[in-house]
């Protein structure tokens, strides 16, 4: 009995450890490293999120940014994530937060995803990924706000920068 309990606990602890901090297959520069809640909220504040917004989180991990956007600001949220285990975790988190009717999580490639509905796009992605995403982000509707946790987009200076504890968050507005 004790062996079964230890084995079960070991497996339960191993799954999140396997997801967290490991590169996804075929994507050596994409890691799941969750944004702290305080930083996620500061990102949404910097973007000026309201109930009229549709917040897309690229590489949404456990879904915390769309969930906070829905819970605290009344916005609709969309998480785009390639890892099906994290999508399942996101739906569980949304149900726990009682905002599953205001958010969606889809398995998708952020380079192929349709972002046309977004009024706010958030990301915590490496500089190389941000650089590759830049043309897609620049093509969004004028006025769309893009907020990055920590990473810049080379050649596109942010409109605002804000320090939150040890992290920097950056805001761009798609020009007209």
Annotate each language-model stretch with its function.
Residues 3, 18-53, 84-117:
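S-adenosyl-L-methionine
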Residues 116-132:
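A short SAM/SAH-binding and catalytic strip from SAM-dependent methyltransferases
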Residues 128-176:
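C-terminal substrate-binding/active-site "lid" region of AdoMet-derived donor-dependent transferases
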Residues 6-16:
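Bacterial N-terminal signal peptides
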Residues 52-61:
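Conserved class I S-adenosyl-L-methionine
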């Amino acid at each position: 009995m004790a062996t079964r309990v230890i084995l079960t606990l070991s497996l339960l602890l191993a799954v999140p450890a396997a997801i967290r901090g490991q590169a996804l297959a075929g994507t050596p520069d994409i890691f799941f490293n969750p944004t702290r809640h305080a930083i996620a909220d500061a990102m949404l504040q910097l973007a000026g999120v309201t109930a009229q917004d549709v917040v897309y989180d690229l590489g949404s991990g456990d879904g915390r940014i769309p969930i906070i956007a829905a819970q605290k600001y009344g916005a609709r949220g969309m998480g785009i994530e390639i890892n099906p285990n994290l999508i399942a975790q996101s739906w569980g988190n949304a149900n726990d937060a009682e905002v599953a009717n205001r958010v969606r999580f889809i398995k998708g490639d952020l380079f192929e995803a349709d972002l046309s509905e977004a009024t706010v796009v958030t990301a915590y992605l490496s500089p190389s990924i941000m650089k590759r995403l830049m043309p897609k982000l620049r093509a969004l509707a004028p006025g769309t706000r893009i907020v990055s946790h920590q990473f810049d987009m080379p050649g596109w200076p942010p409109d605002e920068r804000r320090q939150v504890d040890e992290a920097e968050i950056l805001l761009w507005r798609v020009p007209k």
